[in-house]
């Protein structure tokens, strides 16, 4: 499975999501994207119109939500 993590600086749950994805044994590719370096606020509004928190996570090209949803998917 491929996981894309859209993050912001100093985001604890963004870092936790990256660690979880990298160490789960279920993910073959992790892309960690930082706002400002890899995408803009406008991109977030377009990709995740209802999002209000970070990280925003995409699994195999499908937005799933945030850290809690990733944890549920990988550990459930």
Regions found by a protein language model. Give the residues of each.
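Non-catalytic, surface beta->alpha helical segment in thiol-disulfide oxidoreductase systems
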Residues: 59-76
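Local sequence-structure signature of Cys/Sec-based thiol-disulfide redox active-site neighborhoods
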Residues: 1-28
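Thiol-based oxidoreductase modules, predominantly thioredoxin-like and allied folds used
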Residues: 7, 27-41
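Thiol/disulfide oxidoreductase modules built on the thioredoxin-like
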Residues: 46-53
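Short alpha-helical
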Residues: 12, 39, 65
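A general structural signal for well-ordered alpha-helical segments in protein cores
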Residues: 41, 51, 67-70
